[in-house]
From Swiss-Prot:
Source species of the chain: Lactiplantibacillus plantarum (strain ATCC BAA-793 / NCIMB 8826 / WCFS1) (Lactobacillus plantarum)
Disulfide topology: none
Full protein name: UPF0342 protein lp_1415
Domain of life of the organism encoding this protein: Bacteria
One Pfam entry name: Com_YlbF
Entry-linked HAMAP family: UPF0342
Similarity-based family: Belongs to the UPF0342 family.
Amino acid sequence: MAVNIYDTANQLEQELRQTKEFKELKVAYDTMKTNDSAFSLFKDFQEVQMQLSQKQMNGEELTDDEVQKAHDLADKVGNVDEIKSLMGKERNLNQLMNDLNQIITKPVQALYQN
């Protein structure tokens, strides 16, 4: 019997949506979106993170001003309860996904350990 791994992945995607971690993240995100200033700050923070990450991937040096701007924005984000809650829920979901990744990659790990 042939296994269609993409069917399995699609099933996993559907089941992930039903986990406590994902549902809590969605509630936290929806709650944050109701606070216009928190949502705007969150979007700004995401944009800065993406820009800095892109520069690093391109091998470009970050300027002191860019690093300072990121730190200042992170400080502001850390003072908003809705965003702090969202980030906590993101960590929980990320832990679940890391656990799943370890399970999924077991065959590759076993291959290289022998």
